[in-house]
Amino acid sequence: MSQEAFERGNWQAVIEAHPLESHDPEEWLRYGVALLQTIQPGPDVGKQQQQAALAFVQAQKEGAPVEAVAAEQRQAVMLSLAQALNLAGVDGAAQQASQRASWHGQRTTRLLRHPGKALIHTMHHLACSGGTVISKCLAAMPQVALVSEVNPLNRFGSDFEPTNPLLLLERSHRDLTIEEIKEDFLSRIAQAAKICRNDGVDLVIRDHSHTDFCMGEAPHQLTPITDFLTDQYDLVSVVTVRHPLDSYLGLIAQGWQTQFTPSTLEEYGRRYLAFLDRYQGLPLRRYEDFCTGPETFMQELCELLELEYSPSFLGRFGSIKLSGDSGRSSDSEIALRPRRPIPEEVQVELESSPAFQKLLKRLDYQA
């Protein structure tokens, strides 16, 4: 009852429905927010504020993490600000304050349901699918620290790795075991997460999924960003895709289709399907929708990833430098690109590839 009333903003109903004998920290947090929203000017203001403060103290006694209490208090502030701006007729600012309040509420819920686990946001996409420009736009959001193209199993980088002594040890001594790689990776992520927590920013990891699915003789069974992190961190993740033919033509333009064998459209279709199978159940969004409506797309993406959104990203993303700029000639323009010319042999494959046709149907793209 109090949850439904809370979502509707019926603060008095939340207060009336609150059981004072409750041991549910969420109930006490909702009660505290409702008390703050119903404070009226007058001689009893101090008493009302004290009652709300005691509700938050009780929530903590019932097991709510300090971070969850702080997030809910910030939500209360944003709700009050949104109401004041709305009354003043400043609709745009009121909407932004309301969105921030919703974001703080999301964060509270996650902190309560996954106590003791730091939150990490992850993005998964294949090469040449528009992931870099989308990632730049995410990195341009307030309070976001994005680490681009991460995969501890990748062994196709530069021979010069002065900042990675364990990889140098592997090259000069012996292959590392999966457990040794995992231990090193977790220690690095723990340090990154600690830095982000101390700086008050959200850590976003852009997975280099190309390593897992489009390199070598077969897709990997192990996907380390998810498989290594899921036990220790609370992951909130999304998948982005592009028309597979455009992605494949992008691979050909870079010469990357030779990184998997056989280097055919049929094989690419099989590997793309394996990628989708692995991340089935995650929210999936299209690059084409991003290009035709970047603000709407990014607002929705931030909601899915539980990140704070700001429309100011449009003026900032062009100055952000990330690895993976494989095909985009402009740093600040968001627009659909014309399809690259289709080689004759690819056209023949396109008409006769069962896996690729299955992929198009699954993603609801036309050939």
PLM-predicted stretches and their roles:
Residues 16-24, 60-74:
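Flexible helix-coil transition and linker loops at the boundaries of alpha-helical arrays
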Residues 202, 207-312:
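PAPS-dependent sulfotransferase catalytic domain
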Residues 1, 30, 37, 73-76, ...:
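"A position-specific structural signal for the A-helix of alpha-solenoid helical repeats
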Residues 93-192, 208, 314-366:
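PAPS-dependent sulfotransferase catalytic core
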Residues 32, 37-44, 67, 89:
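Short coil/turn linking the two alpha-helices of tandem helical-hairpin repeats
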Residues 5, 35-37, 42, 78, ...:
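Residue at a conserved register position within TPR or TPR-like alpha-solenoid repeats
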Residues 3-15, 45-58:
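Helix-turn-helix repeat elements of alpha-solenoid scaffolds
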